């Protein structure tokens, strides 16, 4: 199986990180210097993915690696999602 990125889980992960640091969509928009909030809502809802540049900035904002933000179907991602969702 070819590894693929799961946009929905990645969006949920971004949402979780925003909640952890008590950041609003507006806060992230300002930090990324985006013209509107629509892109961020698309990420959070799994409609689209942040660009690699935005992922890089988000990783800095949240103090994590890009791999910690992006979720896919590789076994280590599936285990990580289970742990976050069920164990905390």
For the regions a protein language model found, what residue spans apply to each?
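A short, Lys/Arg-rich alpha-helix, primarily the initiator
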Residues: 1-23, 31
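Short, charged recognition helix plus adjacent turn
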Residues: 1-4, 60, 70-88
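Conserved hydrophobic/aromatic packing and binding residues within compact polymer-binding modules
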Residues: 14, 28-29, 40-43, 69
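Helix-turn-helix DNA-binding elements, focusing on the entry/boundary residues of the two helices
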Residues: 25, 37, 52-55
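Short alpha-helical "recognition helix" segments of helix-turn-helix
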Residues: 27-30, 58
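Recognition helix of helix-turn-helix/homeodomain-like DNA-binding domains
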Residues: 34-50, 71-72
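DNA major-groove recognition helix of helix-turn-helix/homeodomain DNA-binding modules
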Residues: 53-68
